[in-house]
């Protein structure tokens, strides 16, 4: 009977793994530009909080209250990546389990959460940019995985052509990189998190991830939890298989705030002594207070192991610590919600930086954007770039428009359609054609008409809004004249300008507004 129970939980575990692979693959394909992963991205906790996505936040909290940290188990792409690395490590070690119980790093966990809360409440946009797990995975996928996969696919196409191989159904894709800084930072995150996962499993999730701590605080009160039964023989297989290192076998205690419901422990238990359900009051007391009731050598002192080689387990959190942690988690969540709602920033918009169409207010954009780079990876024109210090230190890695290699198509609304945090609000195609995101500024000192005596007028020819005309300067030269009120700033003029440095450049606006085009909209020349 016990073997049947273990086998049943093994299928549950496999189902969790399959679902996790589907989620991570969908995210990866989304950052590759193959599928639209925006619907799934909107269920990521911190972006949902910043966007004021009440439905997503409510569902995630209720799921956690009912079942524990299932979000971390099947919805968080960074957590799923750590599971993959842990699996590779186990195969490398011949399938040998290598985990051991670790005491909760309460001060570290809630210290990181306090940093996030202070950043959200204080307007320090760089804090969520650096700490959100979904955002970290997004940058890794955009700047490391996507270029590597595209390069590999292009190489397969070259081999197919060279050796007259079968048609693989692949199309050549330009490999786009978005700057050395973004690549190096993404690589640093990938290396550190992967090394930690290789050796310690989900240690990052249990000690450093603020989303994990936030949900872990809720998970302490989950209705259904993993708990010990009366048939435990203290073999320790469950603790050795737990990637969260949250199972204290000598004290028959499972830390619900760190358990991610992977169900590995239940599937390996030879006696079926672990159960997932509503624990009894006695079990809750044992879990929360470190009681030795129903344990071997029940006369020992709390926190003392019957194995002399086993370090003494730390007592569980005091009531005061639990209240303080819950208050801090509530403060962080409230900070994210109010930050996304109020749309105020500490500084004015940086001059000349052009934001994506739909980032109507610089204040709202800077406070909601987590820099996940889903828009950067999905831009068909490839003109969205992660900022370095163009927005200041607080806006590092937030997207900006760069017209060096292209211009913004007035008919394209991809970035506003997929933003999960509400930093780029949805813009209808017809509305976008009149949405002013910047203004073209003409610099005659670098214009080839004056510096080289050439006949030019590319900027006027390609302007889709006909906001540039060629006018006589009184000296026999036809020079560009920009009608600033009509210009919408989509960069076609800057991209096509032959001068170096550019004689016409687009400067961004603090507030994106609708302009009157008088029905003169046209695509202009390519």
Question: What is the meaning of each model-derived region?
Answer:
Residues 1-252, 257-258, 263-526:
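Non-ligating segments of multi-cofactor redox enzymes
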